[in-house]
Amino acid sequence: MTNWQQQLPLTDTQKNELDKSVLRYLNWNYKQTVRHEHAQDYESVRHAIVTLSGFLLQESVDRQEFISNNDTSNESMVDIDELLLPKKWNSIVRLQKKIIELEQNTETLVSQIKDLNTQVSELAQFKPTTSNGTSAHNVLKWIPRNLPSCLINVESSVTSVKLHPNLPIVFVATDHGKLYAFDLFNYTIPLASLQSHTKAITSMDVLFTNYTNSSKKNYLVIVTASKDLQIHVFKWVSEECKFQQIRSLLGHEHIVSAVKIWQKNNDVHIASCSRDQTVKIWDFHNGWSLKTFQPHSQWVRSIDVLGDYIISGSHDTTLRLTHWPSGNGLSVGTGHEFPIEKVKFIHFIEDSPEIRFRTPSTDRYKNWGMQYCVSASRDRTIKIWEIPLPTLMAHRAPIPNPTDSNFRCVLTLKGHLSWVRDISIRGQYLFSCADDKSVRCWDLNTGQCLHVWEKLHTGFVNCLDLDVDFDSNVTPRQMMVTGGLDCKSNVFMR
């Protein structure tokens, strides 16, 4: 055996078949081009193919195929595939692409397995106390894995997302004014969809009522705000999987930026803020506007409610605390350099003395029911503030503390590279999303960024949601959902 035969990774039979395939392709190409376009070269090309076959092919039977007249009517040529070589070539390219895709999928699955093994190790350290076998402490310490469990696509950019408090359903609002409900275990098509507004939905909130009066049936309420200056209130009919509109709230004179719905005893109220610089309080049951006040000199971007108090963030870069039943402004926070996109109260949670900001530092704050709040801004920072105690008087509305009416910034979180759009707090973690296309998880105890999800969306990340940890009517689940400008919503589940 010669040296070149040793280098060739083919048996004699395989080499013979390869040579025949090459000659057949040359023969086919000669018949298609030379015979019709270069007739003068017909004989010379055909002679070259015959000569080459005699050189490459040892068996006379194999050579006879090319010595014959190459007529397609020849019976010996009927079962011969002259294009076998280019077909194999194309198949190899497709297989290489498929192999690359499979390798990428394998890397993804290996990463998910590692994340799951880590979660199993963490679960083994805690005693199960919940119905699903997971300790409540561990649920609040959950950090989503690197890749989402499912991906939901809609027709336009996602402006707001909310998880159903009890069921595996996510509600998605879009820039085209559409409202969707998706089953997280079968998300190929929505459970329900509704053109709820004529312009973009800017905000959404949900509440599962908890009436103590047995004559009233509890159900899920969904409130949406829009650029069409309207607020719509819907009931989610679980039996029929549909949105049932209850009423519309009209009164704002410009874009409605945000809405919140909450229940105190058997009373349900809705708060809204607008570019008309006002905040309005509405009675859910009759739709009446109970209170209107103007806490800022510019566009009010965001609000949050805790009992009788509302915190608001504005285009004027400040956040303010207001006692909404009286309309009294109590305190103000200054420190952001650009408009504030989101504000939230930090609720106290029981039996968590090791978590910073989640327990009151004094009995006065404990009796008041709040102490800290958080704001996210276009200046790329997230700030946590201590709220000064107002002057509280029996049977009278609170008034500003004459000696201390300014928020005190106790922690600033830096890491985002663009506007911070939304925030959510669970346990000792704060989750944030921004226009830098990333989602971040921060440790409230240390102020450090623990994890960054950088490739969830191809555009701005507009919103996110997790189950709250302070409502006894809501069992926190290990779930997180995000929505972005790329018309996608990512869902993370344990």
UniProtKB/Swiss-Prot annotation:
Residues 14-46 form the LisH domain. Residues 90-123 form a coiled coil. One of its GO terms (molecular function) is dynein complex binding. WD repeats lie at residues 153-192, 196-244, 251-292, 295-334, 347-395, 415-454, 457-492. InterPro entries: Dynein_regulator_LIS1, G-protein_beta_WD-40_rep, LIS1_N, WD40/YVTN_repeat-like_dom_sf, WD40_repeat_CS, WD40_repeat_dom_sf, WD40_rpt. One of its GO terms (biological process) is vesicle transport along microtubule. Belongs to the WD repeat LIS1/nudF family. Positively regulates the activity of the minus-end directed microtubule motor protein dynein. Plays a central role in positioning the mitotic spindle at the bud neck during cell division. Targets cytoplasmic dynein to microtubule plus ends, thereby promoting dynein-mediated microtubule sliding along the bud cortex and consequently the movement of the mitotic spindle to the bud neck. Following plus end binding, dynein may be offloaded to the cortex by NUM1. Required for viability in the absence of the kinesin-related microtubule-dependent motor protein CIN8. This is Nuclear distribution protein PAC1. It comes from Saccharomyces cerevisiae (strain ATCC 204508 / S288c) (Baker's yeast). The gene is PAC1.
